Amino acid sequence: MNNQLLHLMHLVSPALPVGAYAYSQGLEYAVDSGWLAEPGKLQQWITGVLEHSVGHLDLPVLLRLYRAWDAAALDEVDRWNDFVRANRETAELLLEDEQLGLALQRLSVSLQTKGADTPLSSPPCFVTQFALAGVRRHIAEEDLLYGFAWSWLENQVAAATKIVPLGQTQAQQTLVAMMEKIPAVCAHALRLQDEELGVGLPALAMASSRHERQYSRLFRS
């Protein structure tokens, strides 16, 4: 076991104090509305977001931010940070990204991560600070993509455990089944060109926007 792996495990740990557990990314509304009531619908929903949102936006931009931080190309860091913000389709999703990004930034500053307090034209997204942490800890870029995808997936299944609710065993079965998709999603993200990046999931945007007005919620909005 090497130090880079240990740093990656620390970065993707659910215990990392950034507050990701407080958000469901629209999943709470999708469940509450009955959209995912049929067998297999929950896994289908999470798979769709993993492949077409995380895989087409967060992961390929993470790769570009990693390389920009590594090259000290702050104009590129700024550009891709703004690109991610522009692709958050609801106020809720943008607020989540800002809150997680600022939380990781504060943590990184406290851990004396070089460049963590670099001023950008807009508040840092989570993926922006995640990329910087990966660079400073010498985590390989592909490993960092795997770690990000795993962390996102684990958080979604944890949210589903509370919302559906799933039993602990069923949650682990879902997690193990879906983790098999991560290699293909990451490999696809590595191949994408700049003009192919972005997200367009109407159901996710609808769920998130309606969650903002949901009467009773477990998760933040």
From Swiss-Prot:
Does the keyword field hold GTP-binding?
no
The record's GO molecular-function terms, alphabetically, read: nickel cation binding
| Gene Ontology CC entries for this record | cytoplasm
Transmembrane ranges, per UniProt, are none
Q: Which residues form the signal peptide?
A: none
Claim: Chaperone is one of the keywords in the record: yes
Keywords annotated in UniProt: Chaperone, Cytoplasm, Nickel insertion
Q: Subcellular localization, per the record?
A: Cytoplasm
List, alphabetically, the Pfam families matched.
UreF (PF01730)
Q: Which InterPro entries match?
A: UreF, UreF_sf
Q: Hey, which family's this protein in?
A: Belongs to the UreF family.
Q: What does this protein do, in the record's words?
A: Required for maturation of urease via the functional incorporation of the urease nickel metallocenter.
Q: How does it assemble?
A: UreD, UreF and UreG form a complex that acts as a GTP-hydrolysis-dependent molecular chaperone, activating the urease apoprotein by helping to assemble the nickel containing metallocenter of UreC. The UreE protein probably delivers the nickel.
- Could you identify this protein by its name? Urease accessory protein UreF
Q: Which gene is transcribed and translated to give this protein?
A: ureF
